[in-house]
């Protein structure tokens, strides 16, 4: 049976488009048929799982097969989004779209900065910080495959530009909670844009 998937079509929470999948296997890619009219589409988080069952023609980009060859299992991959983007880009010459992988996790907005203890980001221990800027600086200095930025609303965004996993852990206690984050493994996203700047059709 068909399932729904939500595409983010802009930077705001209200900028989304829900479309139906023609088979359940495409759920793991966050891509589906039926969306058009926007210059950029962003998938849901791309799970690290077995994608070998997704056929090259299961999804059409601008009316053409989205892949030139089937994907392998990504169950042990730490960069599933990047692998999907690379596979889509192998067929760019046919469908005319470019895929880009990225990842980001943004904290909740807190009334004041607090970091109760150390946290672990992608396996690296980030020392207890006493200001938001100090925490951002420590992440940028120490964390492997992750950068941090302080937003105007005082939230903090952890991000990368390759779609690699962002793994947040809190072995010592409540450091992440006080920062406004939740311990988890966060998979990356894939964006689609046509290389000629026209609207993408999926």
Predicted regions and their residues:
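Amphipathic alpha-helical coiled-coil/heptad-repeat segments
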Residues: 1-202
């Amino acid at each position: 049976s068909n399932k729904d998937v939500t595409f983010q079509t802009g930077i705001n929470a209200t900028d989304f488009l829900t479309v139906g999948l023609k088979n359940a296997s495409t759920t793991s890619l966050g891509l589906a048929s039926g969306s058009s009219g926007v210059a950029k589409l962003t998938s849901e988080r791309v799970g690290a799982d077995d994608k070998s069952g997704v056929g090259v023609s299961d999804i059409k980009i601008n009316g053409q097969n989205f892949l030139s060859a089937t994907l392998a299992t990504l169950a042990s991959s730490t960069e599933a989004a990047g692998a999907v983007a690379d596979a889509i880009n192998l067929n760019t010459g046919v469908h005319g779209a470019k895929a880009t992988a990225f990842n980001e996790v943004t904290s909740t907005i807190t009334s004041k900065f607090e970091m109760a203890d150390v946290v672990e980001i992608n396996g690296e221990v980030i020392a207890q910080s006493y200001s938001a800027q100090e925490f951002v600086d420590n992440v940028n200095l120490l964390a492997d495959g992750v950068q941090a930025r302080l937003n105007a609303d005082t939230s903090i965004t952890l991000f990368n530009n390759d779609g690699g996993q962002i793994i947040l852990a809190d072995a010592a206690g409540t450091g992440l909670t006080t920062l406004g984050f939740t311990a988890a493994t966060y998979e990356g996203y894939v964006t689609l844009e046509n290389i000629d700047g026209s609207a993408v059709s999926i």
